[in-house]
Amino acid sequence: MLRLAKRIVLLSTGLVVLELLGASLQVRAQDVLPEAPARPRMSAPVDRNTDGETKGATYVSLDPSLNRLFSGEDPKSLTDLKALQTQQSKVAAKIHQVTVNLQHGSTQGSGVLINEEGYILTAAHVAGKPKQKMWVVLHDGRRVEGVSMGVNRDTDAGLVRILKTRDENNQPWPHAALPAVGERVKTGQWCIAGGHPGGWVSDRPAVIRIGRILAVTDSTVVSDCSLIGGDSGGPLFDLQGKLIGIHSRIGIDVDDNMHVPMNVYMESWDRLANSEAWGVLPGFRPIIGVTADRQSDTKSECIIGTVAPRGPAAKAGIVPGDRIVRFHNAD
């Protein structure tokens, strides 16, 4: 898909990248904590009901009249618009308490609490590397110590944990509602994003933005929620307040954003919880910037279907319809 082939920019502040942000990489030595907390006793991050669903602090029941809008259809009346706005406002009000700011060194990003023990989903480029000390800033400004755990750089999925499994009042940490196992996001679906754009601001809660799902693959969800630096690792919710993705990176425009879907975290959970690191971050591999025309039926040549604007192929003069008949002196 051409949209997914665009040049990309990691969203966390203090990390760098590409001339689009005009930023420079800053690296600061980190204090490494002792061993990360023991792995949870489950193969999924939370205790779930028989459907695999968990109703956390962000869950908002959906009126049957909203089922059509929930599935991605457009509002058709003023009544639809008001009902949609009301539902979005209810979810937005709950997102603040589970959206956190993550800090280590000069880098800041966002994250979301996903169980009572203080586990936090974020982006791999925010978590950095396993077993690093991190500060977790909660919705009310409290700062608590955390540690980075596993990072799947192939998909930009990261895991962090608050060191204490309960807060200072011995209460469990609030956490987001998670979808049922196998529940997938659909193109056109309405979504609600949270995060800390530009980093933590003491008198400002997590910033909420509304959008829709533009595209879905097994490893990426694309939305038009407007995101900028500092939002990386923040949560993306559906209209029921269920967590459906984690902010990863943007394309050329701030309303062309890629998120890591929940199935990636579920599939990688054991390795993430075991503080493993693997893969290469998206956007850091060499790319050509083309996709093949899948409708062409030939084994002797490859027909170019799309060319990413301003990518290496475009700069070399390759256009859709070109035929590749030889590569590296091989037919």
Named regions from a protein language model:
Residues 117-121, 244, 313-331:
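Conserved PDZ fold ligand-binding element
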Residues 16-26:
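C-terminal segment of classical bacterial N-terminal signal peptides
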